[in-house]
């Protein structure tokens, strides 16, 4: 082992002394398979899940990378649809180190009308670390919001701004990026949420490689590796980006990565881009093939916001135009965007020629610090949807088979509703 690797492992081991002995987080849960992320369980570990007295052994896939420490993913297969399972992670002596629960997705097609469901979307998560936080500031707070989100019993949670904002000192270190995410999962308030509901990670600037970086910055490989070690997402699409898709009931989710291929270069034939050709082409092809009523496109940067700053997808003007034109040309119905990357929340309604309005739900800080006043001139913002306090979003899909609808709602740290708006599926099918 090289000196460099020895030092990294020593750093991880030292940091682990202040963490709980074992951490778990439910990852991707499908109809017949489920994934559970774990950390701090030693080199010899086993995983089981049970339902109705039947036990399933999990295949263990250990994380790779210098900073991985004792993390990995347990994959449970051969499960039954729409079933509640309890899982446990055990050491080599058989002692249960951590446990939790999950419910597999429904298998309704050709059997029943699509089931109603709701899921959570989270913005910036900031777990305070005084040693590395900006001086004279306490950026994070109201951690009871995790319990408020858990009380809504989401079918799953989407972390649209990552799990924990990186500090300046983290940006040049793979192990620091990894540990920043691990620390966020050690809070007592968050454990009940992440160990009992599925969680999907999104590549987000704040937690991927730092807000001011792009793919041309140093240590992009470290950022990619740390992300992989921290999540139990579905398999990423080919091409290097962290994009993936999954289905739930009559909805399909296309989770994009606007970090790996993000480039701000604007010179000669080069123009700023966030997705890259391969990822953009995959998205368009996948949307065209999808038979789902609702097609949720998830990315860190708001799509509908027209202000061309680096915080918004509008800064990648060419890609935005290509995708917008394609959605009209190919007559893709039911598309809804979900985003974050803002110190406030809002719902945008993008009016476009030839097709129905595109809705973009942008979630503000979950535990990060929100702004007191919104100054950005987003003229597509839905009236009364501005949220300038810590909050989370719940997206509900419900209604009879011939009259489905999606409802966007924001909630505060106590679980109180701040805003709600419902859009009928029929409105998301109109083309000129």
Question: What residues fall within each predicted segment?
Answer:
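General helical structural elements
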Residues: 8-9, 324
């Amino acid at each position: 082992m090289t000196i460099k690797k020895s030092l990294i492992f020593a750093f991880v081991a030292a940091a682990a002394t202040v963490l709980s002995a074992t951490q778990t987080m439910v990852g991707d849960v499908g109809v017949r398979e489920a994934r559970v992320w774990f950390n701090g369980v030693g080199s010899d570990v086993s995983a089981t899940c049970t339902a109705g007295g039947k036990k399933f052994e999990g295949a263990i896939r250990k994380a790779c990378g210098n900073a991985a420490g004792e993390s990995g993913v347990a994959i449970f297969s051969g499960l039954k649809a729409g079933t509640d399972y309890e899982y446990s992670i055990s050491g080599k002596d058989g002692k249960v180190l951590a446990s939790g629960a999950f419910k597999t997705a429904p298998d309704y097609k050709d059997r029943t009308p699509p089931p109603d469901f709701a899921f959570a979307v989270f913005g910036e998560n900031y777990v305070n670390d005084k040693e590395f936080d900006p001086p004279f500031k306490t950026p994070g707070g109201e951690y009871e919001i995790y319990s408020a989100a858990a009380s809504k019993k989401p079918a799953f949670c989407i972390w649209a701004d990552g799990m924990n904002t990186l500090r300046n000192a983290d940006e040049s270190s793979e192990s620091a990026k990894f540990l920043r995410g691990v620390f966020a999962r050690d809070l007592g308030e968050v454990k009940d949420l992440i160990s009992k509901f599925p969680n999907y990670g999104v590549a987000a600037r704040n937690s991927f490689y730092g807000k001011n970086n792009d793919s041309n910055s140093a240590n992009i490989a470290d950022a990619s590796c740390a992300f992989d070690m921290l999540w139990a997402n579905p398999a990423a699409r080919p091409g290097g980006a962290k994009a993936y898709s999954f289905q739930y009931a009559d909805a399909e989710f296309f989770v994009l990565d606007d970090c790996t291929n993000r480039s701000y270069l604007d010179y000669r034939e080069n123009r700023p881009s966030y997705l890259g050709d391969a990822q953009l082409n995959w998205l368009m092809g996948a949307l065209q093939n999808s038979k789902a009523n609702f097609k949720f496109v998830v990315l860190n940067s708001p799509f509908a916001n027209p202000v061309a700053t680096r915080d918004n997808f509008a800064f990648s003007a060419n890609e935005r135009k290509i995708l917008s034109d394609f959605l009209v040309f190919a007559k893709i119905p039911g598309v809804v965007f979900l985003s974050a990357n803002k110190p406030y929340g809002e719902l945008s309604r993008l009016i476009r020629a030839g097709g129905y309005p595109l809705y973009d739900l942008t979630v503000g800080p979950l535990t990060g610090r929100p702004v007191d006043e919104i100054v950005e001139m987003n003229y597509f913002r839905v009236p009364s949807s501005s949220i300038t306090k810590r909050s989370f979003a719940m997206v509900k899909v419900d209604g009879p088979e011939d009259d489905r609808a999606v409802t966007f709602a924001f909630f505060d740290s106590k679980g109180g509703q701040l805003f709600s708006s419902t859009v009928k599926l029929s409105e998301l099918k109109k083309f000129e």
